[in-house]
Design a protein with these regions (language model features):
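Helix-loop boundary and gating motifs at the non-cytosolic
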Residues: 9-68, 229-266
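Transmembrane alpha-helix termini and helix-breaking/packing motifs in multi-pass membrane transporters
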Residues: 43-48, 159-181, 365-381
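C-terminal membrane-cytosol helix-exit motif in multi-pass small-molecule transporters
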Residues: 169, 191-211, 393-401
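Cytoplasmic helix-loop-helix junction between adjacent transmembrane helices
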Residues: 114-155, 338
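Juxtamembrane intracellular "pre-TM" segments in multi-pass secondary transporters
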Residues: 2-17, 206-235
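Structural signature of the two symmetry-related core transmembrane helices
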Residues: 86-100, 191, 292-307, 387
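Conserved MFS/SLC helix-loop-helix module at the cytosolic interface between two early adjacent transmembrane helices
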Residues: 69-106, 285-291
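Central cavity-lining transmembrane alpha-helices of secondary-active solute carriers
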Residues: 58-76, 268-281
Length: 403
């Protein structure tokens, strides 16, 4: 695992700067916590609080948009002050503080407020964390660096979901609906790894040497960016309008008859395929280019969403969750590496903020549309809509965005 000394004087881990590995550990611990506490929010809203599907879409979309807006400004701020780590620490700390309050939630409004706090933290930390990773690797290592980080992040999700499945089994067995007692146990256990993630970040991640100062202080605007980056953001927005909150795939699994513990185990399958795909996809993108892999991932997404629309039995959903993980593994880390390819080093924080901002802002209308289609048409309708926009995005990235 450890190899020759890096330029910072610390031994490399998996052939990369140690920052990448320890940021992966931070994300792993955070995802253990997040998957235990927040993944089952749609079931908590519907099964425990009796909320409508449109409310689920509102909570999912609004929380992601909060994350998005903050990413724009935190990315810009990290470029302006040339400090990534303090913003990352602040963001992870806010999310950790918000999580225990889910134990006290008694209405969808309180859930929305707590999710706002959690996403506030994520919005602050994510661009700085991504910029720290990009600053810690060479251009030739970028895909591998982001791929390793995504693989570790997703490994945390698998561990969190596996632990959640054990708790669900011990508390409520194979019940079709989530109980309040079960959810409260998930919160109590899930807070612990969140605290540990902040400790690791403070102790083991080091600020990299800042990039050379720009002639002008960075501004939050697109004018200074390459046309390729602007077109990529447009195509991402089109795709994301059909990529509603993952709350809906969870609700669809339950809608087709899957019990709570089966839903959690399906999510384990999703995250396993995600983790197994992320690093190879990153390495492949370093060799073959990133645009084609993103397009291929969107094609898989379209097929999976068509599958969710057409599915009629719970066993079919297991296969769809596996395919959904392949899509995530192919696209998430590769798209972030592609952003770094398209922008100068001194604007990376701002670029990541804009990228995450465009994606997150599109998630609010995407989730509201999905909730409305579910209630007004049928549970399959949001997935037909998502598949159509994925095909459109695939055509857009191949036809408009150059490597």
């Amino acid at each position: 695992m450890f190899s020759n000394q890096s330029r910072s004087g610390r031994g490399k881990v998996f052939g990369l700067n140690p920052n990448v590995f320890f940021l992966g550990i931070v994300s792993l611990l955070t995802d253990v916590s997040t998957e235990m506490i927040f993944t089952l929010v749609p079931l908590f809203l519907c099964n425990v609080l009796g909320a409508a599907t449109t409310i689920v879409g509102l909570v999912g979309g609004a929380s992601e948009s909060t994350d998005a807006i903050l990413r724009i400004f935190s990315g810009w701020l990290s470029d302006r002050v040339k400090k990534r780590k303090p913003l990352a620490v602040l963001g992870y700390s806010i999310s950790t503080i918000a999580k225990p309050f889910m134990y006290l939630a008694t209405s969808w409004g309180s859930v929305l407020a707590i999710r706002f706090g959690d996403r506030l933290g994520k919005g602050i930390r994510t661009p700085s964390r991504d910029a720290l990773i990009a600053d810690s690797v060479s251009a030739q290592e970028r895909g591998r660096g982001f791929g390793l980080h995504r693989a570790m992040d997703t490994t945390g999700a698998v561990l969190g979901l596996a632990l959640a499945a054990v708790i669900i089994y011990l508390v409520q067995g194979g019940g079709l609906e989530l109980s309040l007692k079960t959810y409260q146990w998930l919160i109590v256990v899930g807070v612990v790894p969140a605290v540990l993630s902040v400790v690791v970040l403070l102790s083991f991640v080091h600020e990299r040497k800042p990039p050379p100062p720009a002639r002008q202080l960075p501004r939050i605007r697109l004018a200074g960016f390459d046309t390729r980056f602007k077109l990529f953001l447009i195509v991402m927005a089109i795709f994301t309008l059909g990529n509603s909150s993952d709350f809906f795939v969870i609700l669809r699994a339950q809608n087709l008859g899957a019990s709570v513990i089966y839903v959690v185990l399906m999510l384990v399958v999703f995250n396993l395929t995600y983790a197994l795909t992320a690093l190879p996809a990153g390495v492949l993108s370093d060799r073959l280019g990133r645009r084609g892999l993103i397009a291929a991932g969107w094609f898989i997404y379209a097929l999976v969403y068509l599958g969710f629309a057409l599915a009629s039995e719970p066993w079919q959903v297991w296969l769809l969750f596996a395919g959904y993980g392949v899509y995530y593994g192919m696209v998430e880390g590769v798209a972030r590496a592609f952003v770094a390819d398209l922008v100068p080093v001194e604007k990376r924080g701002t670029a990541y903020g804009l990228y995450h901002g465009v994606v997150g802002l599109a998630l609010l209308p995407a989730s509201l549309i999905a909730g409305w289609l579910w209630d007004a048409v049928n549970p399959a309708a949001p997935f037909y809509f998502g598949a159509a926009l994925a095909f459109l995005g695939m055509v857009g990235i191949m036809g408009l965005v150059r490597e």
